[in-house]
Amino acid sequence: DSSTSRGLGDVYKRQISVVEQYKYDGSKVRQITLPGVGSASGFGGKKSEKEIYFGFSNYITPSTSYKYNVETGSSDVYIKPNVKFNSEDYISEQVFYTSKDGTKVPMIITYKKGLKKNGKNPTIVYGYGGFNISLTPGFSPATAAWIENGGVYAVPNLRGGGEYGKKWHDGGRQFNKLNVFNDFIAAAEYLPVSYTHLR
């Protein structure tokens, strides 16, 4: 049936997965709604069937398998890990802040629902910014324990990484290495607006 397609395109846009379905002629069918801001991977299925399977994970979602129907566009949980962690109790959101030279830098901030944004919450800021490596969202028991106990976990995607391609990578290497540190400092300075404070 030429009206449906087995073709899915998975790309990272602003450090998170964006998945789209296409027909065989290359025309777009739809953008697939993912469970949240995170990483999708491992797409597979049989051409004779209408389902495609994929994995999804982020800072509040343990790696979970989903079944996607190419005809209806609906996704359902296929295999869920036996982890005592309720993702519905947490928020993982993407923001953009301004670095020293005016560059907009993406950052994912994760915390427990009901958190008082009073600037007094313990916060971990984790960044890398080097070797063309992209920091993409993934579940970690250590991070889960941190946010479960009231902590905030923030991951800025510093220049030097691979999130925006070669230009972004080059913007944080060699003579531009100072940008990496400026990006990290700007992330730390952004957070006291609502989440934590600087000492």
Could you say what each language-model-derived stretch is?
Residues 16-20, 61-66:
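Structural motif
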Residues 1-12, 197:
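Single conserved hydrophobic/aromatic residue that forms the stacking wall/gate
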Residues 3-6, 37-55, 93, 141-144, ...:
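Conserved beta-propeller blade repeats
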Residues 72, 79-194:
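Cap/lid segment of the alpha/beta-hydrolase catalytic domain
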Residues 14-16, 60, 102-104:
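Coil-to-beta-strand transition motifs
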Residues 3-5, 24-42, 71-89:
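Multi-bladed beta-propeller domains
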Residues 10-14, 54-59:
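Beta-strand C-termini and the immediately following turn/loop, strongest in propeller blades
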